[in-house]
A protein has these predicted regions:
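N-terminal acidic, proline/glycine-rich, low-complexity intrinsically disordered segments
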Residues: 2, 24-25
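Active-site-surrounding "flap" and adjacent substrate/cofactor-binding loops of secreted or lumenal enzymes
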Residues: 126, 133-135
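Bacterial N-terminal signal peptides that target proteins for export
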Residues: 1-12
Length: 385
């Protein structure tokens, strides 16, 4: 087992939040050291517009939050360009009537509040954060599986990531207990390929689900939760094997490398963004392979933004692309995030939400939009170098 490690960035973020919010109950407008340059009025206005838009989005999310602490949304999975609702999952109407919610959407919404500097005991949205933390903890089963309304391993991973970020920023015994159990389940569910799939203990793996689990494990380990080193190493090896090593698509990632559909797709925006992000978080920065993948993301962004602006592809893909390009830094990220921010601002609805027409629904789109717009604040550990 690895010695517990506490990520310095997570501690600094928590300390900065506490110091700032003792003097002011509202969440801080910007994190220390992240203010846009005063010499660039256009970028300064963009940042201010982004902060205002994100706050309107958070207000919409707060108004939509249910008494259980979560958000209702369609439980399903991507199939080609469509989103298929699972037969065994609770419908949105059933969730609302029975006090259940969509776990992954709720965890992402919780992360949106954290990204704005709100904690369970700090910030204007502290009550929403408290409620969603309690909701996610309540979704923990005896075996450690985090699930609600029929959600699967995607939701488990995002819920684990959310708990890790909350625990790193605010602590809490109940959060720690649920987090440790959820991490143990991920470890136990890792298959012989080194990855994960939709359901616990699936024999096959795919890169999308695997990256979610790996990022959750890394986040947990960084704030002191014990994770076997071998589990991380095997997952990283799976991601590495998913990468094209030569030829026209050098550096790009395959969605699957075994079973049906293996080696069929390696030019998908979200998959390549997720692959680079996973390796970056593991400290692997191979310029020869990463540069082609990052350049692919910049080229592919225009198509995703133009044709999939309200689609699951846009929100999920940019969640990872923003992390991958931010870790790379420099002019590539600046160019990307300026375009991304302007596109997101243009899509905000009059009531403050963002649409997600193909996917879980508008709570998902709004939460993702708020996370991406608030990235410059760097409160979330996933957006700290």
């Amino acid at each position: 087992m690895l010695r517990p490690m506490v990520r310095p960035g997570a501690i600094l973020a928590a300390v900065a939040l506490c110091a700032l919010t003792r003097a002011q109950d509202a969440a801080p407008a910007t994190a220390p050291g992240t203010s846009p340059s005063a010499t660039d009025p256009a970028l300064l206005r963009l940042r201010e517009d982004s902060d205002r838009a994100a706050e309107r989005g958070l207000q919409w999310l707060a108004a939509q939050q249910m008494d259980c602490g979560g958000w209702a949304a369609l439980v399903g999975h991507k199939m080609m360009d469509d989103y298929v609702v699972l037969d065994q999952a609770l419908s949105v109407e059933e969730q609302r009537a029975r006090g259940h919610a969509h776990l992954r959407v709720s965890a992402i919404a919780g992360m949106a509040f954290l990204a704005g500097g709100h904690l369970p005991d700090r910030g204007t949205h502290r009550e929403s954060v408290r409620k969603v933390v309690d909701y996610v903890v309540a979704c923990s089963r005896d075996n450690g599986f985090l699930t609600d309304s029929g959600t699967r391993m995607y939701s488990h991973a995002f819920a684990t990531l959310f708990l890790a970020e909350v625990y790193g920023m605010a602590g809490g015994e109940a959060v720690q207990a649920a987090l440790e159990k959820s991490v143990n389940l991920i470890v136990d569910c890792q298959n012989t390929q080194g990855g994960w799939r939709y359901n616990p203990f699936d024999r096959e793996a795919d890169l999308s689900v695997t990256v979610c689990q790996l990022q959750a494990l890394r986040a947990a380990r960084n704030i002191g939760i014990k994770v076997p080193e071998d589990t991380i190493d095997r997952a990283v090896a799976y991601v590495q094997r998913s990468r094209t090593r030569s030829g026209r698509n050098q550096g790009l990632f395959y969605y699957k490398i075994q079973g049906r559909g293996a080696y069929e797709k390696n030019r998908e925006f979200a998959i390549n963004a997720a692959g680079v992000t996973a390796l970056n978080s593991a400290g692997i920065h191979d310029r020869e392979l990463s540069d082609p993948a990052l350049e692919f993301l910049l080229r592919a962004y225009a198509e995703v933004a133009d044709y999939y602006a309200t689609h699951y592809y846009f929100w999920y893909g940019n969640y990872y692309a923003c992390q991958a390009l931010f870790q790379d830094g420099g002019p590539r990220f600046a160019r990307y995030h300026e375009r991304l921010s302007r596109d997101i601002l243009a899509g905000q609805q009059a009531d403050g939400r963002w649409r997600n027409d193909c996917g879980p629904g508008d709570a998902f789109g709004t939460a993702m939009a708020c996370i991406l717009l608030q990235q410059p604040r760097q409160y979330l550990p996933i957006f700290q170098r």
